[in-house]
Structures are given as structure tokens and as C-alpha cells.
Amino acid sequence: MAVILKNDSLRVPEEQPEKPRAVLVSILTDADTAEDVDESMDELARLLDTAGGTVAARMVQSRSAPDARTLIGSGKVRELADMCRNLEASLVVFDCDLTPVQIRNMEDDIGIEDLRVIDRSMLILDIFALHAVTAEGKLQVELAQLQYTAPRLTGRGTDMSRLGGGIGTRGPGESKLESDRRHMKRRVDALKAELAVVEKNRRTMRQSRDRSGLPRIAIVGYTNAGKSTLLNTLTGAGILAEDKLFATLDPTTRKFTLPGGESVLLTDTVGFIRKLPHHLISAFRSTLEEAVYADIILLLLDVSDPHCEEQLRVTEELLTELGAGAKPTLYVFNKCDREAGDRAGLERMVSDRFRDSDARRALCISARTGEGCDALATALETLIRQGKRRVTFRIPNAQSGALARLYSEKAAVESVEYGDEYITAVATVDDRVYGLLKQFDPNRRTPEGE
């Protein structure tokens, strides 16, 4: 009788599926600089890695203007086809948006079976589909993907079925992509209706937070700047923090106590990126608007990234587009533990960068190690208290509407005590609210003649 030896060490490990190999393509026009194109291509490579692919090669075509048929011209397409065959690449990713006709023309001209041509927006949508966890996130991704994909089905018919799974095809699924336009429109309408309900619930939650009177701070910044890590370090939130682009799609809010004892609400938000598709901004508007409703913006930057200045520009532009560009802002340079060189020099650089604006404050931290986080908390406290005062109001019971006014004006009410004749409320208010209720401050100094 045969003897079967059980030995775990003899087990053959399961083969990991091979990552799809991709050629990255961009064009350098008269309106671009070589440095900008290189930076954008570096970012595209990171996006591909996050999506589960690997870079086989890069191609940059210098042209005075894009070619209408193939973007890069017929000669360069032939060169691209040879490159894909030699490198066994199954994917071509363009660092710009392509028209449906350009995608079809290039796939036909390259002539490699099962090779896909996608653009930067399709890749970003794919990553969002990969990382969507909550019901809201999945609905937002599907809506954005359908809105972007629907016009790109033009003339392809059932050819879409040959794509199979993989990068650029995640999300709604093949059955939806092969549906006719009327079916897709019905699905888009249904998604918008579902999201309207979700957004209503989000507004209710936001109003509930408003009634608490606690200052709201939105942590915003470029994707992978360390926003989730910072929220975890400050509050122990325990949310996913990965070294990947767009690891966080759903905002998370946690209470945080400042050194002086005052509580605030910290919200982690979706990361920004250059060339963020506008249909994606539209689909995720309710999520991105957490920054709009914040009292203070904590703008986090990865100081170890060589493209930090460009990322700051992109983040500020998107904040302005969302209507949050004028908010009081604390600029926080993260990952200082990775920065080689003189730390004092780095601090001076940060201070010099923002010395011309009182509304801008900046400091360096490491969210990973906690270095500088105490100073960050103190800076937030200082920013919050600007123009505010802590007052003990003494309100006659007959004028209890003044207490309701405190809440409606979103004052930070610490305590309320009801007496036989008076209501005693301790609250932190700004100058405007204090002016409305100053008659209930027993310690107020009354100017002569008032």
C-alpha cells in the first residue's frame, strides 16, 4: 500500500497571476515642458502599480499638436506596435484622455489580439473601483465609470466582450458595458437617485455634527500624502492606511481633543491628483464637499516627494474649484522623517514659503512616528481660537431663545445648567455671535454712554 507523506514544506505554492505589462505613452507639445511630462508619467506609473500592472516601457512623442486620428501619428503607432510585441505588453496606457475613435483606431492599427488601449481617466476609475468599499463609494464609482464609458462604446458593439477582466475593465462589469445606451441611461438615472438618498443621509449626519458646535477640520491633500495615517495617529481611528494611491475613498470623521481640552471633528478625505477626471469630481462631489463645510483646512503635503510644489498647486486649484479655497488653512509638511539633510533648514524653507500670508501657517511633522503632532495640535488650537472667546452666559429663563440662538449659530457649547431664574451656558463664540448675545455676559465691560 502506498504511503502518503504529509509535509507542508513539500507543498507547491500557488502561482501568483502575472501582472499585465503596459507601455505608457504621452505626447510633448509646444504647450508642455519636458519636466512636466516626466512628472506626469512618473505619476502614471504609480497609478498603474496601484491598479496591479507593471511598466514595460515608456514612450513620449514630441509633436506641435496631437494627431486627431491616433494622437501620436501613424509612424509612432507602428513603433508602438513593435514595442508591444517585443515586450509582450497587453496594455497601452495614455497619459491623457482619448476619444472613442482614437482608442478604436489605435487598437486596430496595433493589431495585437487582446491588447487594450486605455487612458489616464480609465486607469483612475479602475483604481476607484478596486478600492470602493462602502455602498456610497461603489455607487459613486459606478456612476462615474458609466458616464465616462458610455460614449466610448460607440461603434464597438460586442467587441467589448473580448476585453475580459483586468485593468481598465473593473467596476460596472461587462454586462453593463455591452448594454445599449437606453439601458445605460436608465442605470445612470437609477444611480443618481440612489446617490441622492445617500447624499441626503450625509447632509443629515453633517447637520448633526453642526449641532454639536464642534469646530470641523478637513484633512485634505494629494493622494498618498499620509492623510489616513495622520487621522489614525491623532485619534486612533484605525482606518486603512496603505502606501497606495487612492487607498481611501470614503471620508471618516473622528473627535479629537486639543491640548486645552476643546474637542474638534477631524475628517479624512479623498486624495487629490493632477488631471482628476471632472466626471469623477461630479460623482464624488458629496464626499469632496467635506472640505467645503469645514471650518479649517489641514492641507497635508508629502515633503519627501520631489513633486511636492506641483502637488500643492494641484491641491489648491481643486480646493478653489470646490469652493473651499478661501478657508483658513494650516499647511502641514508630512514625512519629514524621510527627508535627508538639515532639519532646521527644512523648517526655514517651510516658514519662508508662507511668510507673506497671515492666513497661512505651516509646520513639519511625521504622521508615521508622531513627530511634530503635538505642535500640530497646538497650531490647530491657536487657529481655532483666533477671533473667539470663551464666555459664561447668564440667560433669564424668559429669554431662553438666546440658548437656542447659541446652538443655531453653531457655537461650541460646553455646558448648560438650568436654575430657577437663569440658564447658565458656557460656550466658545466668535466676535459676531458674541455681539448678538453680549447682553447675557455678566462680566462684560459696558462702555460709558451705552
How does the language model describe each region?
Residues M1-L24, A45, P151-A225, L231-N232, ...:
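C-terminal-of-GTPase-core extension/linker across diverse P-loop GTPases
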Residues A31-D36, P66-T70, H131-G137, S175-K176, ...:
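Flexible beta-alpha connector loops of hexameric P-loop NTPases
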